[in-house]
């Protein structure tokens, strides 16, 4: 990491059949980004040229970057076949997979400090023979890390308060969640979260709210036994192991998000925690997307470099129409630059 210059970010195009190229062109036209980072896109100039021509033909007033003038690492994969806008397939999956891997290779080689990824389609990856659950798992595999997690960060445009949420489990069926949750898993995720808060946000003595699994956190075993069986005992041990953190919970899931809702919408000074640890995908992401859909950013913690991405998908249904919003991608770029800057600051002891 080069702490003597502006953060060096590499931005992938994501699936070229989705809204990735559109939101990348819109983000690169955003004034002010050049003052906070050195931003390089990685992908195919032909894809960006075609996207720009198509969008401007529909709406000449769109503010789009010119592919001929942006910093671009060319990865020409046109030989793989034709891209059909709005339709993810084996061709678009192979291309987006190649974009990501080239970005990882360059970052691991020290050319960049952070990767910002536009969205991909898991179905397109699978059609191309790449059977990863998502970009997060590819990043972890290529970086050689076994302990990693998905965290979501959003800053309220109303109050300035920042919501930080980590998922203990991610893309697994709901019926598998109780078996996947173990004290060992929770310890690993909590350690990642505490490291992230200290390293990336400068919060060395955080408060962390931890959700229960069952309605009313099991209501003393009447609505589920996981809290009594292991979650409460685990929390008691965790409080001893991590005295620097205030660990609150297990909190009934239906009330854990009341404080964040108030802090996000009306009162940034209300009583809230520095971070929220949700036990499964929808428990954490329904409130995140309800409050912060256009501002929420996915960041992978546990990697040796910064990675962020917008918290939305490829949106094939609106690709090529010029109506995709770049807010989340712009926020992802800004957050990546902030996290790189934070990692360059001396850590408080």
Curated annotation (Swiss-Prot):
One of its GO terms (biological process) is pyridoxine biosynthetic process. Keywords: Cytoplasm, Metal-binding, NAD, NADP, Oxidoreductase, Pyridoxine biosynthesis. One of its GO terms (molecular function) is NAD binding. It catalyses: 4-(phosphooxy)-L-threonine + NAD(+) = 3-amino-2-oxopropyl phosphate + CO2 + NADH. Homodimer. Catalyzes the NAD(P)-dependent oxidation of 4-(phosphooxy)-L-threonine (HTP) into 2-amino-3-oxo-4-(phosphooxy)butyric acid which spontaneously decarboxylates to form 3-amino-2-oxopropyl phosphate (AHAP). The keyword Nucleotidyltransferase does not apply. It is found in: Cytoplasm. Pfam families: PdxA (PF04166). The active site is located at the dimer interface. GO terms for cellular component: cytoplasm. This is 4-hydroxythreonine-4-phosphate dehydrogenase. Pathway: Cofactor biosynthesis; pyridoxine 5'-phosphate biosynthesis; pyridoxine 5'-phosphate from D-erythrose 4-phosphate: step 4/5. Substrate binds at residues 136, 289, 298, 307. Its cofactor is a divalent metal cation. The keyword Transcription regulation does not apply. PANTHER family: 4-HYDROXYTHREONINE-4-PHOSPHATE DEHYDROGENASE, D-THREONATE 4-PHOSPHATE DEHYDROGENASE.
């Amino acid at each position: 990491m080069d702490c003597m210059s502006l953060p060096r970010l590499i931005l992938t195009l994501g699936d070229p059949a989705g809204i990735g190229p559109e939101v990348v062109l819109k983000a690169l036209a955003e004034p002010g980004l050049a003052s906070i980072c050195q931003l390089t896109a990685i992908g195919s100039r032909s894809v960006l040229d075609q996207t720009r021509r198509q969008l401007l033909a529909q709406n000449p007033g769109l503010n789009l970057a010119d592919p001929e003038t942006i910093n671009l690492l060319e990865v020409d994969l046109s030989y793989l076949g034709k891209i059909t806008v709005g339709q993810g397939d084996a061709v678009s999956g192979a291309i987006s997979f190649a974009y990501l891997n080239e970005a990882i290779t360059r970052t691991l080689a020290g050319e960049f400090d952070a990767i910002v990824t536009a969205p991909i389609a898991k179905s397109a990856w699978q059609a191309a023979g790449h059977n990863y659950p998502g970009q997060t798992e590819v990043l972890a595999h290529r970086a050689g890390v076994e302990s990693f997690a998905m965290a979501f960060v959003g800053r309220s445009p109303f109050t300035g308060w920042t919501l930080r949420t980590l998922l203990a489990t991610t893309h697994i069926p709901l019926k598998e969640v109780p078996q996947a949750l173990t004290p060992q898993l929770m310890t690993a995720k909590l350690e990642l979260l505490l490291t992230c808060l200290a390293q990336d946000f400068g919060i060395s003595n955080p408060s962390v709210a931890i959700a229960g699994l069952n309605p009313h956190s099991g209501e003393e075993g009447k609505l589920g036994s996981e809290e009594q069986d292991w979650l409460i005992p685990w929390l008691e041990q965790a409080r001893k192991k991590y005295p620097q953190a205030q660990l609150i919970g297990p909190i009934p899931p239906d009330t854990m998000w009341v404080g964040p809702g108030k802090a996000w919408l009306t009162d940034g000074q209300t009583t809230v925690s520095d971070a929220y640890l949700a036990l499964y995908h929808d428990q954490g992401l329904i409130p995140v997307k309800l409050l912060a859909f256009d501002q929420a950013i996915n960041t992978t913690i546990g990697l040796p470099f910064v990675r962020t991405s917008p918290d939305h998908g490829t949106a094939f249904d609106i690709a090529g129409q010029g109506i995709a919003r770049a807010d989340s991608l712009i926020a992802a770029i800004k957050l990546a630059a902030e996290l790189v800057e934070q990692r360059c600051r001396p850590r408080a002891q």
